[in-house]
Amino acid sequence: MTSSIRVPAALQEKFDTIALATDAFCDQHLNGDYKQLIRLALAALCRKRPSPLLKGQNNSWAAGAVHALGMVNFLFDDSQTPHCKATDIWAHFCLASSTGQTHSKKIRDALDMGPMDPQWSLPSHMDANPLIWMLEVNGLIVDIRQMPLEVQDIAYAKGLIPYVPGRKTGN
């Protein structure tokens, strides 16, 4: 997962305004993991040159960010916790669905997001996301969790996995 909240000074006010709106939505409907991940996405968008956030309304970008991360993490599946409907997002930010979906698509394209994207997955979804753990070792695709601890250590040192599964507490 991306981990930097660095924001260029010229976009700090824009970031703060949008993040305040997304934080309020997360506090009401989602959780702290979503709040943090959305802030990371907004910061990444601020660092793009030119930043797409320079065009459009703040509430459109806020709704788009919530929706984009929701798409990656299956927010709209009622078997997930938390979950909500896209219409709840549009209503909260007072937007038409077409506007929110357009901004969501712009964010997903700009940050190269897709379903179960390891970079944009919620921490609570890491263990269950096979895309995070499938790596090529000696020409074969393997689940790194099934490999020896030394191989897991190497994968972690290279930044290929978020943590060493064999060293995670509770294993």
Where are these regions (language model features)?
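Basic, alpha-helical nucleic-acid-binding regions used in initiation and control of genome expression
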Residues: 1-59, 70-171
